[in-house]
Curated annotation (Swiss-Prot):
Binds 1 FAD per dimer. Binds 1 AMP per subunit. Heterodimer of an alpha and a beta subunit. Gene3D superfamilies: HUPs (3.40.50.620). It comes from Bacillus subtilis (strain 168). This is Electron transfer flavoprotein subunit beta. Keywords: Electron transport, FAD, Flavoprotein, Transport.
């Protein structure tokens, strides 16, 4: 099987986030593989172990993403591709990234493309479905189980707590939801082997893609942190009195009714 994994380098949202002049200050930030993409990587590795094949990890970004690609190689991917847009696109959006990926993937032979359900830094979940639409292939999002039998595929996907079962055929694009598997940690031998595995760097010119054709369609007006949570209030008295006070607070302070 020819397996491709869409991977994104993100900052760890568990760390403190600083916003200045409308931009996230990433100096000193901890950068990681998007956690949902780790599920995709692990699923690709398990499929390769079962069916054989080659796994290619692909990311769009700057040169700094090489570190995360090497981590993917250490986990078990066979090769990696960095599509460097650092000097070409300023603040690319989901349209931009999907266009870049499409111009790369359309020339590749693939059976299955895997990606994370969402990126923890943006959370739109748009890139993979957009790419599938451009490639004109089936797309199943938020999968929690995947079985491949020849050119047939069966998947279970999370639907707000329920499960939906879907059958389709390859080639296919899927996005991974938490619970699909338990991503492995890179082993020491894996880390050593990753240093020698091929990592190709491409630019838009290599894809015959003009900057104008991948210009973002969205413009960010403002970025801000959510308000700090205030201490809760403990309501006293009988249930009827508590209910009355709660309604009053919702109207006067929360202003939701």
């Amino acid at each position: 099987m020819n397996l491709f994994v869409l991977m994104k380098r993100t900052f760890d949202t568990e760390e403190k986030i600083v916003i200045e002049t409308g931009k996230i200050q990433d100096d000193g930030a901890e950068w990681i593989i998007n956690p949902y993409d780790e599920y995709a990587i692990e699923e690709a590795i398990q499929l390769k172990e079962k069916h054989g094949g080659t796994i290619t990890a692909v990311t769009v970004g700057g040169e700094e993403a090489e570190k995360e690609l090497r981590t993917a190689l250490a986990m078990g991917c066979d090769q990696a591709v960095l599509i460097n847009i650092e000097d070409d696109l300023d603040e690319p959006d989901q349209y931009s990234i999907s266009q870049v990926l499409y111009h790369y993937m359309k020339d590749q032979e693939f059976d299955l493309i895997l990606g994370g359900n969402v990126a923890i830094d943006g959370g739109s979940g748009q890139v993979a479905p957009r790419l599938a639409e451009l490639l004109d292939i089936p797309c199943i999002t938020t999968i929690t189980k995947l079985e491949i039998n020849g050119t047939d595929a069966e998947a279970e996907r999370d639907v707000e707590g329920d499960v939906e079962k879907i059958k389709t055929t390859l080639p296919l694009l899927v996005t991974a939801q938490q619970g699909l598997n338990e991503p492995r940690y890179p082993s020491l031998p894996g880390i050593m082997k990753a240093k020698k595995k091929p990592l190709e760097e491409l630019e838009l010119d290599d894809l015959d893609l003009d900057e104008e054709d991948a210009e973002p369609k969205l413009k960010t007006i403002e970025r801000f942190l959510p308000p700090k949570k205030e201490a809760g209030k403990l309501l006293q008295g009988e249930p009827a009195e508590q209910a009355k006070e709660l309604v009053s607070l919702l109207r006067s302070e929360a202003k939701v009714i």
